[in-house]
A protein has these predicted regions:
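C-terminal nucleotide
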Residues: 2-13, 18-21, 30-32, 36-83, ...
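Short glycine/proline-enriched turns and hinge-like loops at secondary-structure junctions
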Residues: 23-25, 102-103, 143-144
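N-terminal pre-triad scaffold of radical SAM enzymes
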Residues: 89-97
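Short aromatic-hydrophobic micro-motifs that form the base-stacking/packing surface
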Residues: 99, 277
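DPxDG-like acidic metal-binding loop motif
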Residues: 101-121, 125
Length: 325
């Protein structure tokens, strides 16, 4: 039996520049961090005396006798890619799926990590990220970028640069107290809405040539945000930049936000938030705000109908927390 633990991520700047149509020509950059909310994948070989060859437990339970009959596309393609059968797999998570935290990619990375361990194989972080990207984007044919798989695999607070030739993961090195100050100034709220990121990504790709300049601006903001963090500028400038990138992001597609989300956002700004954004591709999920500590109680009151999620940054990425041959 193998149990893996894989973090979710929050993307601050550069989201959208990690889609192949953009980074292969212009280069992409993302500033993101994983945090201490996780998905857990428990996997083991299933004895052959059952009347089904594999069982998968997630939001529903599947018992199948043929790999092609697995309904969950990610599980089906991971099983085929790893050439596995007679598997029992269970998925658990701290936060719901389809909420802009890279949950499906964390599942993919955690599942691959577990499957490799079941086969007695060591697999490094880059291999896991590359395999998850291939399975989600090629085998599952889902629209989207590549930052989520990289973040889930590597973990930590990173700048990820992407080009036609590949990607580089560069840790953002900050004094412990400054990183804590940033962490303590960020507030996460669940809107109650979920979304399919591939649907939103398809909306972004419509009339894509008209959006190149805005994506280039969003990419340049990664440099600006990194400079704020490492050069000792006031961290409230980071919050103000979140507001600017959110405005740009909304302009990419009409389905990224809606009137309810806009109202929530404006309520937080009026209560004292410097800025914020909807995490992930858009359409629902989690709102992240930068709020000075003395104003956080007012923002919580303004958004009292939303679930507030305290969190801490994490550095480990996917890992095996239980292994028994």
């Amino acid at each position: 039996m193998v149990i893996t633990k894989t973090p979710f991520r929050m993307s601050f700047f550069g989201g959208g520049t990690d889609i192949k149509e953009f980074y292969s020509e212009y280069g992409g950059s993302v500033l993101s961090s994983t945090f201490d909310k996780y998905c857990y994948v428990t996997s083991r070989f299933l004895p052959e005396f059952f009347d089904y060859f594999s069982e998968f437990v997630y939001s529903r339970t599947e018992r199948v006798t043929d790999i092609d009959k697995i309904e969950h596309p990610l599980i089906r393609n991971c099983m085929k890619f790893m050439n596995l059968q007679n598997i029992r797999l269970a998925y658990d998570a701290d936060l719901p799926a389809r909420t802009g935290l890279g949950t499906s990619s964390s599942f993919a990375v955690g599942m691959l990590n577990a499957f490799h361990a079941l086969k007695g194989e060591m697999c490094n972080k880059k291999e896991l990220a590359d395999e998850a990207i291939y399975i989600e984007r090629v085998l599952c044919n889902e629209s989207g970028g590549i930052q989520d798989q990289i973040a889930a695999s590597y973990g930590g607070f990173n700048r990820i640069d992407m080009s036609e030739d590949g990607y580089q993961v560069k840790p953002i090195i900050l004094p412990k107290q400054r990183k804590k100050e940033l962490n303590d100034s960020l507030m996460l709220f669940f809107t109650g809405f979920t979304h399919m990121s591939s649907t939103v990504q398809n909306g972004v790709k419509e009339n894509f040539s008209d959006k190149i300049r805005r994506l280039q601006t969003m990419k340049s903001m990664v440099d600006d945000a990194q400079n704020i963090l490492i050069k000792g500028s006031h961290l409230s400038d980071f919050g103000k930049m979140l507001h600017e990138t959110w405005k740009l992001k909304k302009s990419l597609s009409s389905i990224i936000s809606n009137s309810d989300i806009d109202d929530m956002y404006q309520s937080a700004i009026k209560a004292g938030a410097e800025g914020g954004k909807l995490l992930g591709s858009g359409g629902g999920g989690f709102l992240l705000f930068y709020v000075d500590k003395d104003k956080q109680k007012y923002v919580r009151e303004a958004l009292k109908n939303l679930l507030y999620i305290p969190f801490n940054f994490e550095n480990d990425g996917t890992r095996i927390i239980y292994y028994d041959e």
